[in-house]
Amino acid sequence: MPMEYFEQRERALLGDRFDVLYAAPQETAERGVTVSALRSSPEQFAAKADFPLEASPFCKAAFVVHQPDFKPGRHPYYHAGVFYSQEPSASSAAPLLGVRPGMRVLDMCAAPGGKSSQLAAALQGRGVLVSNEYVAARADILKSNLERMGVSNAVVLNESPARIADALPEFFDRVLVDAPCSGEGMFRKEPVAATQHNNALVEHCAALGAEILENAAAMLAPGGVLVYSTCTFAPQEDEAQIAAFLAHHPEFTLCDLNACGFGRPGEENRAPGCTDITRCRRIWPADGGEGHFMAKLKKSPDAEAPAPVRVKPGKPAKTPPEWLDFVKTTFPFLADRPLTTAGDWLL
């Protein structure tokens, strides 16, 4: 049984802490909204909202909604892009990047768009946000949500991480990897996830996350910051994933998240031998959220550049003049870059 495997693993790792950490203060998952700074400040929103709110500890812009029958998709503020409907603890990862206006930011696994909307709000219309989603149908949802949220400086991609890494090595100041995962933190919110859970899924997601993390690291500029997050408890996808990455990437340092104001440290016994792993952050059900894991990685300013990508020459595609005008106006720093290579769009 899936839940038997999960509980046996977690009890072995946590011991007598299992019942404490998995005891949620509420019976059902919290409902919440995250306010976009492109539309309103949290203070203005709280003063004008016509439904009961409580500030969330996970993000200054996030609120818990205390109204069981609240339908966010029917509210005018939703359609005006004032808020994104999001479980409150899911808003915790994006602010850890420390995005500032003018930066080049990548959201690697961006759909449906909650974290991208947070990153766009931090950019305040300056710089560029590249929001990528590998699954085409989800990329359409991502695009729709960013349009609704009033984001004007984003490029939505439907690409593999490897192809983006080939095109844009060491390009981004900040990278968010909210990795595809086994979803153990969502069992309460999505009960069907528990019925589909097994160790093979965990191992598959761990391997996929490792591949995505490698490509993300290649796209991060020296001195840049990468945040890796999941909504699972599995060590292979969390602490052990980060420990394995650090063992092969001495140019990266694990930043300490213990002053972030929420959650608890990473678990040492989930990555034996990596004493720094407690610098990561976990949110347990006992903390008032669903299950989340976060690690913040900083790339050395002196990191060596990756080997140049060699692309087989081909007949250049004719670039539409409308696209050139758009790039020159919106992203002037991209104007001198090739827009296509062997017929493939780079951006």
Give names to the regions the model predicted:
Residues 1-347:
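S-adenosylmethionine
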